[in-house]
Amino acid sequence: MKGTFPIDKFQEIQTPFYYYDTNVLRQTLKVINQEAGKHEGFEVHYAVKANANPKVLNIICQAGLGADCVSGGEIQAAINAGFPANKIVYAGVGKSDWEINLGLDKGIFCFNVESIPELEIINELAEKKNKIAQVCFRINPDVGAHTHANITTGLAENKFGIAMRDMESVIEEASKMKNIKFLGLHFHIGSQILDMGDFEALCNRINELQDQLEAHHIEVKNINVGGGLGIDYNHPNRMPIPDFKDYFDTYAKKLKLRDGQKLHFELGRAVVGQMGSLITKTLYIKQGTAKQFAIVDAGMTDLIRPALYQAYHKIENISSDEPVETYDVVGPICESSDVFAKAIDLNKTHRGDLIALRSAGAYGEIMASQYNCRQLPKGYITEDF
């Protein structure tokens, strides 16, 4: 089953471009709010790194989500889109001074701090501005997620977070700093996680840490468990909205929250992944010795995930209903890795046919580059047509 697209309108647009189905986005946001709203103290932040298209950000902001940012640029993008500063959290292992100052000036909710040297700099910069910086400490729980090695973030070998053994000393250090206010703990174990057992393992680790801190009379008002919930890349039409009920229920059942504690989530891919498709045009059908190639005008510069992560995206010829043939779908970039898929079945494809690479709403447009001096792809939402 193919997706539904305004194909006639697409003929007028220069390819390649991203198309964002805002009906899917709004329905996804509705389900998120419904399911998270069933649990007291659950607060959801959108991970801006997944897709920072201004029109997309504005819709997400209007739905009431907060923003999870990993750079000064993302903080500014969130502010520009209307996200309240007191609902913005800022993470990242390498925060520059200007980015920290921006967060302080805007009055963001908190900095997710990843090391003592970073904490010292935040305190120093806050002191110069006579401000109090609210912080959560990102703890590396050494929990492995069943996902691609490049997108695991919670193992001891990863660069992210503070080791569990150092947690108490870091909190003690923060208590001595006059311009730091400790708010809680932050975790994030990875991305594109579909096994709820991974989130259960995180809950168990957090429960252990909370008991440990409680024994030392350390109060934790906020727990941020990051995001990581994946999407179904194989069946974008059958499963356009992830199982948010199971996701939020897992934390509600397995995590032992204290009275009055807030539980924060940072969801990106699960919010925007299925609403987006990369639309590209077929340039040539090339007969090789043992295969045929569908050469399209989009490349790894427009969607790098297949080359970077060997990621799968369902590919559809949305112009043709002819019987299927087998193709390698490749782009124009001067790299052998510029391949979207090998030996896939598409309806018989001709020059000029429009091809849709589905489930491209997350880590697509935002990761595009101008390698080979190519233009960046534009992003359009349903309302643009």
Predicted regions and their residues:
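A charged N-terminal "starter" segment
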Residues: 1-133, 175-181, 211, 215-218, ...
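Short beta-strand segments
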Residues: 47, 134-140, 186-188, 224-226, ...
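Active-site-proximal loop/turn and secondary-structure-junction residues that shape catalytic pockets
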Residues: 48-52, 73-74, 94-95, 115-117, ...
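Flexible loop/turn segments at secondary-structure boundaries
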Residues: 52-55, 76-77, 144-145, 190-195, ...
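Short acidic, glycine/serine/threonine-rich loops at helix termini
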Residues: 57, 80, 100-105, 122-125, ...
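Hydrophobic residues within beta-strands of alpha/beta enzymes
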Residues: 67-68, 88, 111, 185, ...
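Active-site loop/helix belt of alpha/beta enzymes
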Residues: 142-284, 346, 372
